[in-house]
Regions:
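Flexible "cap/lid" loop of the alpha/beta hydrolase fold
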Residues: 122-127, 132-165
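Short beta-strand immediately N-terminal to the catalytic nucleophile in serine-hydrolase-like folds
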Residues: 111-114, 138
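Conserved catalytic-core motifs of eukaryotic protein kinase domains, centered on the activation segment
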Residues: 54-56, 81-87, 146-148
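Active-site loop/oxyanion-hole signature of alpha/beta-hydrolase fold enzymes
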Residues: 72-112
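An N-terminal hydrophobic leader/cap segment in hydrolases
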Residues: 1-23
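Gly/Ala-rich beta-loop-alpha elbow adjacent to hydrolase catalytic centers
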Residues: 113-121
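Conserved HGGG/HGGXW glycine-rich cap/lid loop of the alpha/beta-hydrolase fold
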Residues: 27-29, 34-80
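Structural signature of beta-strand start/N-cap positions in the alpha/beta core
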Residues: 41, 69, 108-110, 131-134
């Protein structure tokens, strides 16, 4: 009952819906994105915190549509994109960004990334420089802190959260 009330209250404003939503059928699920404006392409990548989505940029993008073709997307597992039961890694998001630019935008693109999304944007640019023009980072995290190998404790916690009964109980 509490979850239903919480769901109703959190979705009553319908903040993520938009008449201009598009979906990119990627190999791990449908990726929701919006496209506005004309000019040089500019892709916005949101942070990886709970509750993040392309909605983070809704006030900013209208100021840029005169000179740029703006793309905002909800990363896999966020916003209105699919949320498959897989392990989300920087490599997964690197592939998503590269495939999105290659298959949807189709030309060299400038990217604006925030917070924890910065490392996989850097990796994507390093591995596929032909798809990237400029990179703009907002509040980037330390690359050192993002380059840590999971400890035994972290692996144990992931195992516990992935266990159907225990993980579902903890999340709900």
């Amino acid at each position: 009952m509490i979850n239903r009330i919480h769901h109703f209250l959190s979705t009553s404003g319908n903040l993520l819906s938009c008449s201009e939503n598009h979906y990119y059928k990627w190999r791990f699920g449908n990726i929701k994105y919006d496209k506005k404006g004309k000019g040089t392409p500019l892709l916005f990548i949101h942070d990886l915190t709970a509750g993040s989505s392309s909605y983070e940029f809704h006030q900013l993008i209208n100021n840029l549509t005169d000179q740029h073709e703006i793309y905002t997307l909800d990363l896999l597992g966020y916003g209105l994109s699919d949320k498959p039961s897989i392990t989300y890694t920087n490599n997964l998001y690197e592939q998503l960004i590269t495939d999105f630019i290659k298959n949807i935008i189709g030309k060299k693109t400038s990217v604006v990334a925030t917070g924890n999304s910065v490392p996989f944007v850097i990796m994507a640019c390093h591995n596929n420089p032909e798809f990237f023009d400029k990179m703009i980072f907002i509040n980037p995290q330390s690359l050192y802190s993002q380059n840590q190998i999971p400890s035994k404790q972290t692996k144990l916690l992931k195992f516990i959260f992935d266990t159907p009964v225990i993980g579902t109980f903890i999340y709900n």
